[in-house]
Amino acid sequence: FRMRVRYLEQPDNKQISFTPLICMHCVDAPCLKACPSKAIRREDDGRVFIDENRCDLEKECVEACPYGAISINVEKEVAEKCDFCTHRTEVGLDPACVSNCPTDALVFGDLDNPESRISKLVDKKKAKAWKAEEKTNPSVLYVSHEKWMEEKANTGVQLDPKDEDVTYEQNNLKK
């Protein structure tokens, strides 16, 4: 499913957030421009898709993504990322993360339809783009996030380093 949930501790240690990070399916996707093998393309519905058959694992896409959303599948030797569960959404189902979220915190829908549930929530909750300064025009928006979350999210999971059962990740490199 290629979603990473980052455990982020606020700098003053008064708040902990579990923040899901997925591919933002950017309108101006840096990964698409960076891929030398043209394995990344935009679908008609706006999704950014990696064709595993064309991926030559040059890794430029991994470096180009400002959200850290692309990882390397070492077994298949390809880059991969969230595709909004195309296999589900093509048959009218929500992505797995949305349908399995116990708190209903994830919403999927058509942002171009002002009557859709997601469009109404975006307006009501004042949802914002993650790392708006990157000017990628992402299709994924967040409610109630703060700048400190963005700054910590790509650096890995911030947990007690004495906890040996924790796997720290940074761009799919296990530490």
Where are these regions (language model features)?
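Non-ligating segments of multi-cofactor redox enzymes
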Residues: 1-175
